[in-house]
Amino acid sequence: MHLRSRSRSLSVWLLLAAALPAHALEFSKAELERATALQQRLVTLDSHLDTPATLERADVDVLQAHAGNRLSQVDYPRMVEGALDGGFWAVYTGQGHRSAAAHLDDRDTGLQRLLKIHTLVVAQPQRFALATTPAYAARIKAAGTRVVYIGMKNASPLVADPTVLRVYYAQGLRLMSTVHFLNNAFADSATDTKGAEWKGLSPAGKQLVQQAQAPGIVIDRSHASDAVFDQLIALSPVPIVLSHSGARAVYNHPRNIDDARLKVLAVHGGVIQVNSYGGYLVDSGASPERKAAEKALIDHYGGWEHVKIADATKLSAALKELDARYPIKRATEENFCAHLEHVLAVVGPQHVGIGMDRDGGGG
């Protein structure tokens, strides 16, 4: 979501307030009216929605509101209520083993998630529509429909056969990151505890970036290492983005970006979308015992991907019990605001947007 003026930046905050607790922020009637009028003229997008993962849950209906349920943060009723016109819906594949068989599984998983997105769009043409250009997005909003841009988080589905990228582009892919939590065949991750494998992009990664940028796919540096950022800037004839990242000056985490690179990003014409993933906003101070207890709890429900929507309330209550036994610091809207205000001060609103990481741990 590209902000081009401070008034637009303000409008985003006002619109964002709809998703925050009622006590969190207060605005005057005039401010809200100004924000509403501005939003009606703008296409308001979130640059990183992990909602396609939710589409694969048999017990979740994205057409129904699931307010208060941690397993579903984005649905059609709340998009309408919160004035979110749409966003980039992520084809996400978790980084696992890197065997030939695993890469084939990743290829199939990615294509299946892409199919889920298209199935939703085809089944609900009055509510969702695919966008591939800003002009399309504007027309979709004018029709009262939600915008579905397609992004890819982790390029692992392309390792087995990089030419599949052409299929993704033809089916709407317009934003792509090279890597996720762990190093892969294309790039080093910012968070792999083993450290750098390629010292940035691998030879295959450099080739993939060039192949993606040629038809117009924007490269997303989020989750990649600092060395990957530096190489993307050097290699890319067009701007890159960080679809869901934070400010390292506010919280020193490798997933966040330092001020020097923020300024380079801006000079290169790029944009950072500030994310709301608590672990990247503040240090929770979780003890090893807390981490082990939380893992055991999630495993009891079969892992995050297999938790039933009906069990989410019980899971939330159990996590609160863990908070009492093993206190941690939880990120707040003030912490998010600190990151947002910092990057605005460093590079200006024309280089700042919002990528909340909803349905992927954000919020």
Q: What is each PLM-predicted segment?
A:
Residues 11-21:
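Bacterial N-terminal signal peptides
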Residues 23-198, 252-363:
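N-terminal hydrophobic targeting/anchoring segments and the immediately downstream early-domain regions
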Residues 161-165, 228-238:
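Distinct, well-ordered alpha-helical segments
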Residues 197-213, 232-242:
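Alpha-helix-loop-beta-strand connector modules within alpha/beta enzyme cores
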Residues 226-227, 247-249, 278-281:
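Short, catalytically relevant binding-site loops at active-site mouths
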